[in-house]
Amino acid sequence: MEKYCELIRKRYAEIASGDLGYVPDALGCVLKVLNEMAADDALSEAVREKAAYAAANLLVSDYVNE
């Protein structure tokens, strides 16, 4: 967990303690957020490219949601 930022560690603790809801389809959740980020013109092009690249890599991986 040390390699992740403080905000991620905080949310992890909240989910683990039951204070924040757990999402069973974690990959679907990640892809949804990455898609929203990649499409958000308010974000920098660099951030949008990182989100698009990460999402594309997940889609090429074994993840299939049908």
Swiss-Prot record:
Q: Pfam families, alphabetically?
A: UPF0253
Protein family according to the UniProt entry: Belongs to the UPF0253 family.
Q: What is this protein called?
A: UPF0253 protein YaeP
The opening ranks of the lineage are: Bacteria, Pseudomonadati, Pseudomonadota, Gammaproteobacteria, Enterobacterales
This protein's gene is called: yaeP
